[in-house]
């Protein structure tokens, strides 16, 4: 008799994706973050569902409903902080996952990579809209500033902003639609993630060496299921430590003040995971230029396969490219720090230099370095 997991139409799909999946025997812990992102998404959907049961998307009651969740709902504060800090864990895993893809040349799987970039943009949009929902000062002003960027688009800009707002300012209509979008997008993300996985399983996983591992595959279960569970335990431990010891560490104190359109906070800034892009936006004095640079900072990922000039796929045996990669990581950390600083000397010039360096490394230095490495190896 054939095993049910190999014959049942539904079980067969699960089996081919998570049990009998042939996996390279040498993939490292950097390959754990895909499964961690799946766990983060499930956690966010579940905690978000319970929050939505008690939240009201009306400007007069939104802030109070969040306070009610924290004070009166059984373990509401745990659910709320799991959701807020779960988003931070989500982005930590996302950045590492993308970084791994860049380092080991995983972007050569074009379909998987392009769906991944779409996923990144969708998750960023979802997180931004979620940040608006508690209707604190930073929620309101963050929404106002970021949606206002659309007005930089020539000719249709102003109409576009008012269309997004549903009025002449960020108000009840904006909050209601942001709540609706914030609720539906995670399910779209789940669907996209399934497509992402589908494309990945067409080609099989990459591995640290960047060369074909067809002759050296092992089943996903039990080897990588155990490995993924260990990674998940570490992530959950980190998340619970954050939630139970310092839940407001990554938040903004201004968001504990109800939204007031008549009072602008001294420093408007988004959540920490958007600060690198925010720093690039602010480093250009021109509004349209800043918006284009902001978009380019993420969309540049789509160009990665075209910018790959090395004869080797992975950076494992390319020390010059490795140095550049870690300079890029340091540059992104610098941009994240700058994004949270006030717009004054010396932060302005540091931000501008870091922004130039970001694009310079990706568009110029990495391709040239790869060509030099090819020549050194006489390829």
UniProtKB/Swiss-Prot annotation:
Its main location: mitochondrion. It is a multi-pass membrane protein. It is found in: Mitochondrion inner membrane. GO terms for cellular component: mitochondrial inner membrane; respiratory chain complex III. GO terms for molecular function: metal ion binding; ubiquinol-cytochrome-c reductase activity. Pfam families: Cytochrom_B_C, Cytochrome_B. Binds 2 heme b groups non-covalently. InterPro entries: Cyt_b/b6_C (IPR005798), Cyt_b/b6_C_sf (IPR036150), Cyt_b/b6_N (IPR005797), Cytb/b6-like_sf (IPR027387), Cytochrome_b (IPR030689), Cytochrome_b_C_euk/bac (IPR048260), Cytochrome_b_N_euk/bac (IPR048259), Di-haem_cyt_TM (IPR016174). GO terms for biological process: mitochondrial electron transport, ubiquinol to cytochrome c. Component of the ubiquinol-cytochrome c reductase complex (complex III or cytochrome b-c1 complex) that is part of the mitochondrial respiratory chain. The b-c1 complex mediates electron transfer from ubiquinol to cytochrome c. Contributes to the generation of a proton gradient across the mitochondrial membrane that is then used for ATP synthesis. Belongs to the cytochrome b family. Heme 1 (or BL or b562) is low-potential and absorbs at about 562 nm, and heme 2 (or BH or b566) is high-potential and absorbs at about 566 nm. This is Cytochrome b. It comes from Phacochoerus aethiopicus. The gene is MT-CYB.
